[in-house]
């Protein structure tokens, strides 16, 4: 039995290594646009489940961990920005506001699965327009839900966090470790 991380995210690899160094990476080929849900939190959970199950189908004897993160602000859902204009739009929407980061977690082995969602509330200070424009010209915002990396430059905008810090990076370490204990 092997442990598989169903994600190519470098941040998730780093965080999974806090739980265990013994895992392999196999990414899923799930078309995220075909999955819908009734809330942002349920969407994150549904996407994580789809990713974990897709990899588990091909690796039924292994434990597979799938994740997905979405950002929610005033009812709008933000995934990864498509381009610079999209990143600017997202960051302007988050500037000076409270938002939520939902990360779905799904652990599978064969037909057995356990899934949950972790939610963290983030309070952003207002982002100066020149800072925002300079930020979107860096590579940092483009592979992250909500167009920011809390562990990077965006830490300067973060006035407060309620909940799991690692959840904002895409892998709630404590919750994931708890779920994994049920499978190992």
Feature-to-residue mapping (PLM):
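A short beta-strand-loop structural module common to alpha/beta enzyme folds
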Residues: 24-33
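Residue-level detector of short coil/turn "hinge" positions at structural boundaries
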Residues: 22-23, 142
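Short, solvent-exposed secondary-structure junction/capping segments
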Residues: 23-24, 69
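Short loop/helix-cap segments at secondary-structure boundaries that form the rim of catalytic
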Residues: 14-18, 35-36, 57-58
């Amino acid at each position: 039995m092997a442990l598989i991380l169903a994600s190519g995210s470098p941040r998730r690899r780093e965080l999974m290594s806090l739980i265990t160094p013994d895992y392999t990476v196999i990414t899923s080929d799930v078309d995220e646009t075909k999955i819908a849900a009734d809330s942002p939190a349920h969407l994150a959970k549904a996407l994580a489940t789809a990713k974990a199950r897709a990899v588990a189908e091909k690796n039924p004897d292994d434990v597979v961990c799938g994740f997905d993160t979405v950002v929610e602000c005033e009812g709008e859902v933000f995934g990864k920005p498509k381009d610079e204009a999209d990143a600017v739009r997202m960051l302007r929407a988050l500037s000076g506001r409270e938002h939520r980061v939902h990360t779905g977690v799904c652990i599978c082995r064969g037909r057995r699965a356990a899934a949950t969602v972790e939610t963290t509330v983030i309070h952003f200070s207002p982002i100066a327009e020149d800072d925002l424009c300079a930020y979107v010209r860096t590579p940092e915002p483009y592979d992250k839900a909500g167009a920011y990396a809390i562990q990077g430059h965006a830490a300067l905008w973060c006035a407060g966090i309620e909940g799991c810090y690692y959840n904002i990076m895409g892998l709630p370490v404590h919750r994931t470790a708890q779920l994994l204990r049920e499978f190992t």
